[in-house]
């Protein structure tokens, strides 16, 4: 760009150019006037760029600090004042038309930052009107009138050519001053509620000044003088089309392009969220805290926040470096050593929404049991298969974990090599509860989308194999093996601590507050599955978690009574005579399962292991308490009556069995089978 020949000298900027800054102090305006004067000298002489850039960073940080005092108006005024500053830079660059204009980073990037602030203000203002109605927030009438004029000006700037973007600067800042005066008057007269103020603050998130400084620093240090050197996205174009708007003769589009795409800026609520009332649950707290400190608790839930790393710190912040070591020591003292690198869960140290999960447990040196899986805690399948998620097992002799594994839904692992083997089940094509043979948890839900794992675990006290310091539910269990979710000091886990599960506090608290219907504390940990990441650690040895799984299968046709008796006697005979294949499988616990054979769909099939016979009997007894009580009374009356002969007793019991009524000869399993058949035929 060649300088103008008819211009003998370039006049310096006049003091009235800085009068349009809204809400700024006199000292800041004087500092800004000196900044624009230095900018004028840099464009003419092409020197002094380093001093100017350092002063530019100081002015931007001072503007951000001054705008924080206005609370609800902080983001709105900061964005508008930055728009005014970049507008001045662009106007003086075009006015002087200096040969070395683009050597200055502020002159080179003035047009781009002006576009950025204009589109950002337009999107925020458009969402101010749309989300206000959807969130049932009625803003004051006078304030909405001024904001509507503000939106009209922004739409014209975004629709028109970007060459005339810097025009009308004073008129634009006059509308901003009207909004500032109206809002201040309403707040002084208590005509605007805290919820309305918080909504205005949420609608206009402040711009990250540190991001602007980082971009300018990169352009300055790398000596970029052409925008083609920057890694920028491809320019979006819209194809002209014939519509009703073309009848007016205007070659432009009525809707700005920024409103047609997803403009997900930092701190701005996602474009597909219309109701913002969940973000305004505590308006007083929102007004009393910093914007990004409050909105960070909604990270990933409608808002995207990232912490900018300062690449340049001005000289005004250099003396504060001596205080940094002391601040780091204080942060290390207040950190939670048991939660950052815990044995079972790693808790985030910063969580403004929920706090740290360590508050739900004992002190840092104590252990906390989140879930315990003993052999007496039966996993009952409800509306799908039952699965055991990633667990960590702890032994009695050592506090370090010995195994990390994932148990499939229908697979039953043996507690030790001396337990009774179980009859291998055959899979059918029509079986609703299919067995996931692969141990990979990620592939299981994809192949079986209907098999949602819902788990109910019952807390237990310390026993021979697990010795925690705190348990959720006190009960006496001896001689059992199990696995538990553990939280303890970092030295409890050897090896790498980089990949340790993270659990949400709100999710954990909601799980711990659930109560079962049978009187005992039942904790549904199925909701913890989405937020639990498996511990990546080598297993020293395999520790089994014995479980009892009940498979329910509908009966299509009634079967005679001898078949039912044979059905329940067969698992007991199979358990007493283990097969050579099961013995070989016990010796090699890590062997892959054999392919299952196909069989036809049969009647009700209730199979369990011999060692879990008492557990299943107790579960079924709780399902039918009245019938069980009647059987006990009949059994007591039968013992007192002492029948004359067994033949007479059989003659009396025979008709009752033939009539279909419950008698004392039916055990709890036959009673359960009878009830299922009755409900099926009904």
From Swiss-Prot:
Ranges of biased composition (kind: Polar residues): 396-413, 452-470, 654-665
Alphabetical keyword list: Activator, DNA-binding, Early protein, Transcription, Transcription regulation
Stretch list, region Disordered: 396-470, 558-667
Domain of life: Viruses
Biased composition (Low complexity): 558-586
Keyword Transcription regulation: yes
Biased composition (Basic residues): 420-434
Molecular function terms, GO-annotated: DNA binding
GO terms for biological process, alphabetical: regulation of DNA-templated transcription
Job of this protein: Transcription activation.
Family: Belongs to the herpesviridae TAF50 family.
Name of the protein this chain belongs to: Putative transcription activator BRLF1 homolog
Protein species of origin: Equine herpesvirus 2 (strain 86/87) (EHV-2)
This protein's encoding gene: 50
């Amino acid at each position: 760009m060649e300088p103008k020949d008819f211009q003998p000298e370039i006049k310096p900027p006049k003091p009235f150019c800085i009068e349009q800054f809204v809400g700024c102090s006199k000292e800041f305006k004087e500092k800004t006037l000196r900044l624009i004067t230095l900018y004028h000298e840099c464009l003419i002489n092409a020197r002094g760029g380093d001093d100017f850039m350092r002063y530019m960073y100081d002015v931007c940080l001072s503007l951000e600090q001054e705008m924080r005092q206005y609370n609800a108006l902080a983001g709105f005024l900061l964005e508008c004042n930055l728009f005014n500053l970049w507008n001045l830079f662009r106007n003086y660059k075009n006015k002087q038309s200096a040969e070395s204009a683009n050597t200055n980073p502020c002159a080179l990037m003035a047009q781009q930052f002006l576009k950025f602030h204009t589109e950002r203000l337009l999107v925020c203002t458009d969402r101010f009107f749309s989300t206000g109605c959807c969130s049932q927030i009625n803003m004051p009438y006078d304030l909405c009138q001024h904001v509507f004029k503000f939106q009209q000006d922004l739409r014209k700037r975004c629709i028109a050519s970007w060459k005339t973007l810097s025009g009308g600067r004073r008129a634009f800042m006059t509308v901003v001053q009207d909004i500032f005066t109206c809002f201040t008057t309403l707040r002084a007269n208590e005509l605007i509620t805290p919820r309305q103020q918080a909504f205005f603050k949420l609608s206009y998130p402040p711009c990250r000044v540190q991001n602007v400084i980082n971009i300018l620093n990169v352009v300055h240090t790398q000596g970029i003088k052409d925008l083609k050197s920057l890694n920028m996205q491809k320019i979006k174009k819209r194809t002209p089309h014939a519509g009703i708007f073309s009848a007016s003769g205007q070659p432009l589009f009525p809707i700005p392009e920024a409103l047609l795409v997803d403009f997900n800026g930092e701190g701005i609520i996602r474009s597909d969220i219309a109701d913002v009332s969940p973000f305004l649950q505590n308006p007083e707290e929102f007004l009393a805290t910093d914007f990004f400190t409050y909105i960070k608790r909604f990270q990933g839930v409608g808002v995207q926040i990232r912490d900018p790393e300062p690449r340049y710190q001005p000289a005004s912040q250099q003396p504060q470096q001596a205080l940094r070591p002391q601040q780091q020591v204080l942060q290390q003292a207040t950190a939670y050593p048991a939660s950052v690198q815990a044995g079972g869960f790693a808790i985030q140290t910063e969580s403004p929404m929920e706090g740290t999960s360590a508050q739900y447990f004992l002190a840092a040196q104590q252990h906390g049991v989140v879930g315990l899986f003993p052999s007496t805690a039966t996993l009952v399948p409800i509306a799908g298969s039952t699965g055991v998620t990633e667990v960590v097992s702890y032994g009695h002799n050592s506090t370090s974990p010995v195994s990390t594994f994932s148990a499939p839904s229908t697979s039953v692992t043996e507690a030790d090599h001396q337990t009774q083997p179980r009859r291998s089940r055959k899979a059918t094509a029509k079986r609703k509860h299919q067995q996931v043979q692969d141990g990979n948890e990620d592939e299981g839900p994809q192949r079986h989308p209907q098999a949602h794992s819902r788990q109910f675990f019952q807390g237990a006290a310390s026993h021979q194999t697990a010795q925690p310091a705190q348990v959720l539910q006190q009960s006496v269990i001896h001689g059992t093996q199990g696995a538990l979710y553990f939280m303890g000091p970092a030295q409890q886990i050897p090896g790498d601590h980089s990949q340790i599960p993270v659990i949400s506090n709100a999710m954990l608290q909601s799980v711990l507050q659930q109560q079962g219907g049978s009187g005992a504390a039942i904790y549904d940990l199925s909701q913890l599955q989405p937020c639990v990441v498996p511990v990546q650690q080598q297993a020293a040895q395999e520790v089994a978690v014995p479980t009892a799984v009940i498979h329910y299968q509908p009966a299509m046709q009634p079967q005679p009574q001898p078949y039912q008796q044979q059905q329940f006697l067969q698992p007991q005979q199979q358990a007493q005579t283990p097969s050579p294949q099961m013995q070989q499988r016990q010796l090699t616990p890590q062997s892959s399962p054999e392919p299952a054979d196909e069989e036809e769909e049969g009647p009700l099939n209730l199979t369990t292991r011999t060692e879990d016979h008492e557990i299943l009997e107790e579960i079924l007894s709780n399902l039918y308490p009245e019938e069980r009580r009647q059987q006990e009374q009949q059994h007591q009356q039968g013992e007192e009556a002492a029948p004359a002969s067994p033949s007479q007793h059989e003659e009396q019991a025979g008709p009752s069995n033939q009539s279909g009524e419950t008698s004392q000869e039916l055990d709890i399993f036959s009673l359960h089978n009878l009830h299922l058949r009755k409900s099926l035929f009904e």
